[in-house]
Regions:
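Compositionally biased terminal segments of proteins
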Residues: 1-275
Length: 275
C-alpha cells in the first residue's frame, strides 16, 4: 500500500510556527542544536516549492553540553507549553486553531555518548533518540536564519544550524535503508534537482567530505536505492512529488537520472560493482 502524505498547508504552517518557537525557547543553546529531518530542504533551498514537514527534529551535540543542561532543556520546553509523550525523547505542542499537535523529537548521533545497543542515549536523566548518520551534522553544517509567527502570536527571526546539503543527502541515504518513508527519497530528489549551481556545484561541495565513512555509506545507499527507475528511490520520490504538482512518470525518471548523474560525478561504484 502506498504511503499517505497528508501535507495540508495549515499543518505545515503550524509545524513551521513550532519550529521557530522551539528555536526561540532553546535560543541559548543554538550553537549546540541543529535542525535536521524534513525541514532542511525548505530552509536550505527556500522558495523552490518544497512542501516542508509535519514534525520538528532537533539534533543535540551531546559532547558540547555542560552538566545539567538537559534538565533545563526539558524544563524550558514544558514551561513553553510542550507536553511529554510516551516516547521518551518526544514532545508535542498544540497550536491554536490546529487540531493536530506538532511533534518535536530530540535526537543525537550514534557517536555522541556511551556506545551501547540501546536506541536512546540517557543524558543527564533525559532520553535522546540515537540515529545513525546524525553525527554528520556535527561535522558538516552551516548556519541560516529562519523566521515565522509563533503559536501564541508574534513574529521572530532566529539563527539555526542545519546540515550542509551534502551531509543531509548522506543522512537520508542512511535512512532509506533503515525505514520506509517515501518523503526521504523525495527530499533527496528535491535537494539534488534544486541545488544552486547544479550538479557540478553540488559535486564540488562533496569533495572535502568523501573520505568520511558515513558519507560513503550514505552515497552507496543512494546508489543502491536509485539503481534503476523501478527502485524505491525514484518510485517513492515521484509519489511525493505528485503532491507538489509534478507528473509522476517524469518525476520518477528525473529522480533516477539526476541522482545517478551526481553519483557518477562522485565516482560512486554502480550497485553491485566492487568499490
Amino acid at each position: 500500500m502506498a504511503e499517505n502524505h497528508p501535507y495540508d498547508p495549515n499543518d505545515v504552517a503550524a509545524c513551521r510556527s513550532v519550529l521557530v518557537e522551539a528555536l526561540t525557547v532553546l535560543g541559548k543553546y543554538r550553537d549546540r542544536i541543529a535542525v535536521v529531518g524534513g525541514w532542511v530542504p525548505e530552509l536550505a533551498i527556500p522558495g523552490q516549492g518544497h512542501m516542508g514537514s509535519l514534525n520538528v527534529d532537533l539534533a543535540l551535540d551531546v559532547a558540547q553540553f555542560p552538566p545539567n543542561v538537559y534538565e533545563t532543556i526539558r524544563s524550558d520546553l514544558l514551561a513553553a507549553g510542550y507536553t511529554p509523550t510516551d516516547i521518551p525523547n518526544r514532545f508535542e505542542r498544540k497550536v491554536p486553531g490546529n487540531p493536530t499537535p506538532v511533534r518535536v523529537d530530540l535526537l543525537c548521533g550514534e557517536y555522541a555518548g556511551e556506545r551501547s545497543g540501546s536506541t536512546h542515549e540517557m543524558v543527564q536523566g533525559m532520553a535522546v533518540w540515537k540515529a545513525r548518520g546524525l553525527d554528520l551534522v556535527v561535522w558538516f553544517h552551516t548556519k541560516i536564519r529562519v523566521s515565522g509567527t509563533l503559536p501564541d502570536g508574534g513574529r521572530n527571526d532566529v539563527e539555526v544550524t542545519i546540515p550542509t546539503i551534502p551531509a543531509f543527502l548522506c543522512m537520508k541515504g542512511i535512512l532509506l535503508v533503515d525505514r520506509k518513508k517515501d518523503k526521504d527519497a523525495y527530499d533527496v530528489y528535491f535537494c539534488v534537482a534544486n541545488f544552486p549551481g547544479g550538479l557540478k556545484a553540488l559535486s564540488s561541495d562533496f569533495q572535502p567530505m568523501l573520505s568520511n565513512n558515513l558519507v560513503q555509506e550514505g552515497l552507496r545507499n543512494l546508489r543502491a536505492k536509485f539503481s534503476t527507475i523501478e527502485d524505491i528511490g525514484p518510485v517513492w520520490a515521484a509519489r511525493v512529488a505528485v503532491e507538489a504538482g509534478a507528473d509522476e512518470e517524469f518525476a520518477r525518471r528525473d529522480a533516477f537520472e539526476q541522482i545517478n548523474r551526481l553519483l557518477d560525478l562522485l565516482k560512486i561504484p554502480k550497485h553491485g560493482q566492487p568499490a
